[in-house]
Amino acid sequence: MNQKVVIIGGGLSGLASAVWLSESGWDVTILERRAALGGRTHAVSVPQVGDIADNGQHIMARAFVNLFRYLDAVGTMDHMHFSPIGSRMRDGSVHPTKQGMGSQLQMLFGALPGLPRRDRLKTTLACLRFFTQAARADIALDKITVAEWYRRVGMPDSAREIVFDLLALGVLNELPELASAYPLASLLSTAMKKSVRGGGSAFEFGYSDVDFDTLYVNGAQRIFSERGHQVHYRAIARQIEIRNGRAVGVRMADGDIIDADAVVCAVPAWNVRGLLDQVPGHDSVYAASAKLISAPIVSVNLYLDGPLGSEFWLENIASPEHIIDNVFDHQIMHPGRDTGRGFRYALTTSAAYMINDWPNERLIDAQMRLLRQCYPNSPHVVHANVVRENNATFTQRPGTALSRPSQQTQIPNLVLAGDWTKTEWCSTMEGAVQSASFAVSALQSSMSASSPVHVGI
């Protein structure tokens, strides 16, 4: 009889753990507290225009090797596409953004789109200092914010507005004035290493031509159905049961215990408290999770009666108002898309503290004013679907760099998974799936499985 693993949480880290453990012969049971799988990456219905959209458009990079291994496993990797992106200025001009190693060279030579001539030499010198320090990723950077780091290397405000503040917002989902500098340095160090190994293509950016449920969830559900695995929805786990130094099951909210030979706890940082009460060392995990507070992202699936006039599938908006960070053009992303019920654009705003509580009407009015300044056309709104993810990601403030816990616990058959655990990445989809890879590897090793799962890079 196959060994049984119970996975608490059906987000990306839980799904990847389930699929890979299933591949190596485990009997899998998933406990998901919501009514659907996918966690913080899921599709949303927009019945007003008869469309299926997402709860927030994501950018993916070729360096996301663990995420793409998961897509291969569930049969959806062929939905990924990679193509150039651009930067859109307030004056309506748009500039192609260099990708891979080219983006770093563009910055080093002060050739940022829209950068005033007077700031080019300053930007070059600042970038030399910035990327040199990023490559080292000194833990001392955890004592200062990203904004302070920019000031120390002499980064001009113009360069920050055009690229560097958007960089921090995009990868950390936090304001430069609040985010620790170390996670940004660590991610850039990882990026540079992977770019060298990948011939400069590791940080080419891409998107999928299907919704999140189709991309991440449906293929996994097919696997679970074909292999007889169980998925329990609206299943609230209360505590992992430990006996004689091993996990033996999961106690549910109704008092029932689901037996297990192993447990993967794949919940967000803010949901872990209570689950590990019987686990030695749980206080340190709870303390770590308390430091990794959540940050919001506001996304708008915008349907217009005509095209904006985008030139790239993704255009970053260089604007100090921080009302829109990115504009995704679904007509470019999905050639031949039926526009009879509206031209669809996805707008995203990271670390959206300022606009998160705005009424929808105020938000859309402000965003449309900005779009009309930046784009050649001025279409009208057909419908706007606003999605507020209050707990979109965790955020790392100064002093939290060493807080993220390992996937391995003091219980050999219990592992943690989730983007908030220790990985090479900050709070990203790749971080979530890499955590699953690490968790599965740790579990297989501790259980001395005869056929260990192939782990990602």
What are the residue ranges of the model-derived segments?
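N-terminal Rossmann-like FAD-binding beta1-loop-alpha1 element of flavoenzymes
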Residues: 3-30
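Mid-domain catalytic core of redox enzymes
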Residues: 236-346, 350-357, 361, 370-374, ...
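Helical element adjacent to the flavin cofactor pocket in flavoenzyme catalytic cores
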Residues: 190-254
